[in-house]
């Protein structure tokens, strides 16, 4: 059979694929072989020497041996067993077995399990303590060199999966050990706290601090007591068998009190899923699983360690009702009756459009569905929106124009396998850290090409093959110029255009102004570089374009998004693996909030409210008439409050009072509302203006689904009971609706999803049963459950099945005048999320990044006499901020960068204005200028020494195992067996 090999294993002949190693074949065939250092997500590391088998009569490491036709493999011979035991002996020389009192005795310790499986009763080489102390310096995990077996999993994960490139093994020492950067304490290194190392560690050497002293019944014993206990046990032990049996009993007992629950991350749009280990209300650790569809074993600092907010003392636990200038606690019944009374009163007096509703991109799909149903079906208004209006609506608009669906056209796996990745206006490694690891890995190990266009030199820019810095707001110019160049030079995919795309002629005409000369003049990118970009894109077999708020948050954001999609059509980069458009969604469920109808002009599944047949479908199921005119965007709502047309708002899980632009203007609007309801887990800045505050539950306290940036729908399961009297948002919305007479009878979020699936064609086959565990579905989903990981393989969702080249022109950015000479770019930092309402609750994160800072260029610092820690005031026409400076070459000239992670005097939206994308009302946050005033010259750097940005990474490929093999004290176990040696020294 083509592609198959005939293999003999332990005398049995079988067929196997040639695209695997011997160990993979053995594992797939359920043939047990020790493999302490091997991890499927890491590949062969070759450090442990326990996976040795006989291949054609020669002892070899099975993890790295490529399978060949005719191979004869023996896993049972005495020589194989001897070699494996020699490898295991060396591991036990480095690792002391005290399993019963070990926090890692939870059934997953590779050393414990391998000793048991190999039936090793005694080790030939006594354990020998290493001359190193534990490194406890990091807030989230610790390293115990004395227990480290030098398998290198952590190094492999850091170097080639996460690609932070912090960890190495110093093989030159007498007793090698893992080191961080140039051998500094963990907390002073370039470690980004992603947690990969502790996730893949096969034992207790690298472990989350949340586990220490908490996991076991006999753990947490102080060292003065523990050490004598271990020594006494060693003195009386009769063999490992009995000791391991006792530890297995203790491990089984732990299952009674340690709960492991699958959830989906509540932070960015990557959609990482993982198990949360808890004891009572304590979170012991987050444990990602290989089968997690978006992230596998990967996490970032927030997803792995940023959960302290769930148990914060600042959580809201009872409803609050305003009395004058303060709040008092109230019972649910009183709060709900007040809301129903006020909503009814205002609706009757001013009409349903005097009320407006904001749903949350932090909440579940089911909760977004209910919020828009409350607005439309109970109140009778289409005034409902979500925070995609602040970030992703322009990208959605651009994709609707050109390809018909407002979501990523493929999956993260497509991005990883692309020939070239084009990143525009996205600080991917900090905004979507796990997704960025897939690009960094492909770039490092596979030679994937990366082009970055951004005004700021972030990590992905530094790693890229080509980095260009266009003038702010000019991306559409170079995009159109490159498309024009490719078409005119015969480098467009003419067959794709002819067979699958409409509008070519009009589009080509629209490109006439976009010559290379014009593009150079307007963008600042020289013609030679523009041609280089065009040639790289044109020659690539497959291209993925990624973009984010650096594109969308401009007054021409929709048009630039359209231009990106146009360029992909010109080059035929839709409908095939490794290609397509990827507008990176910012929040965990900003995609889902829009998908499930929290938009003023769209019902769930993006069906238009103006479509009579669509409305009739919903009216039949909901049993009420629906409004037919599109409602207000959240941006318009603020203006309608000021004009007196909007009287009441219900805001759920959205910090509008900080994340909307021109927040002084927003706050003034809130004060004019007749009635304001805010539903949140904390008394947010927005909630401070409310008349009623309802205590909601975060994701760990409820069931539901999120939809990530790939259109991937995933289930989350309840980890904790709601704190105090807080409730899941879906229950609160239902109770509000029922006080208004709705009569809803949902018993579980699954009931809500079932209703949505009946109404919206793109969810037709979505059920909770199909989403069980780590299963997921990428919409559109057919009724039979078949989903769509890759869109547009056969047709585009337009009547004739063809995409559309949609002509767009450049809208120049807003001018602020010469007085405001500093351009204030803004965005995210890795450690914090948005205004920091969640992440500043984490002590460890706050220690590493306690405050925001203003990045300024060395040249601007020299011109103004600024140093690290200088306190400045930035003033725009709309407000001012006070913030400390940090000098860095990540920015240049009079470009500065102010992260959005502040809710006080440095909150970026004190500076931003109300101007917005002309097509979607998305605020033009990135078009902000200010003047600078020095308030205090001398100060302490806002970036602590322990921040990873001060580190010194050490890039290398993997663990450099050849350095181990070159050591004088190393002998390959296979050679030791040949020489008749009992162990390898």
Swiss-Prot record:
Gene3D superfamilies named among the record's database cross-references: 2.40.40.20, 3.10.20.740, 3.30.70.20, 3.40.50.740, ADC-like domains, Dimethylsulfoxide Reductase, domain 2
Domain 4Fe-4S ferredoxin-type span(s) in chain numbering: 139-170, 182-211
EC number assigned by the record: 1.-.-.-
GO cellular component, one term: membrane
Positions bound to [2Fe-2S] cluster: 37, 48, 51, 63
SMART domains: Molybdop_Fe4S4, NADH-G_4Fe-4S_3
Essential cofactor(s): [2Fe-2S] cluster; [4Fe-4S] cluster; Mo-bis(molybdopterin guanine dinucleotide)
Listed name of the protein: Probable oxidoreductase YjgC
